[in-house]
Amino acid sequence: MSAFWSDALRARRRIEIAKVAGAVALPAAISVATLSGLARADDVAAKLSYCKDCHGQSAQGYNGYFPIPRLAGQQTEYVKNQLQAFVERRRTNNIMFNVAHTLSPAMIAALADDFRRLNPPPFGGAPHPRAAEGRRIFEDGIPDANVAACAACHGPQATGSGQIPRLAGQLYPYVINKLVNWDRERGQNRAKPDTSAVMSPVAHSLNKSQIEAVAAFVSTLR
């Protein structure tokens, strides 16, 4: 099969998955059996291949109608925490719940470690004139709106740390979508509060234009 048709089939698959999110569970044939100890290399390779069908062969993300995040270079602890958040319904996404609840802790650790080592170029596509405004917000915050500098937590280069995510190179439309819909997707299990609560007042205090500016800036970083 040519590379063109392979890419086309993957794109069609992403759209189909997005349309049926929450309606059906993933087929048992693609689930991963619970592993004890270290995840086997062949199991990890198979699951990585499946993940990359949606997140991209270099984990660069998918910049389409249904934006799928960049995982390349992401903090390992953040990836592990978020996969568990899908399982515990602290973060809502029916597609990712169906993926995450099949994974053992060893498999999650192996996947997170692999994604951390990848470093493809940023996807691009953001309106560059907005990046200058976004940089000011990222570095200085918005004192009048009680918004702290993004860099205070995410680091001066937006690389994150521990359970604080890397934003550098993240897809422009994905960042916008997450901030606009923050309270509908994060911190949903009140019995298990998590670090997403820190971002709630920030997401509330930024208007759509400011969110777009920050997204434009971080999407260009390496």
Regions of interest found by a model, annotated:
Residues 1-19:
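N-terminal secretory signal peptides that target proteins for export/translocation
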Residues 23-38:
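C-terminal segment of classical bacterial N-terminal signal peptides
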Residues 35-48, 58-67, 117-144, 165:
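Electrostatic cytochrome c docking/interface patches
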Residues 43-89, 93:
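The feature marks the first
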Residues 49-57, 111, 147-157, 214:
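The canonical Cys-X-X-Cys-His
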Residues 55, 87, 138, 154, ...:
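Protein kinase-like catalytic domain
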Residues 62-70, 85-126, 161-166, 185-222:
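Axial heme c-ligation environment in periplasmic c-type cytochrome domains
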Residues 73-75, 82, 169-172, 178:
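Extracellular/lumenal glycan-associated surfaces
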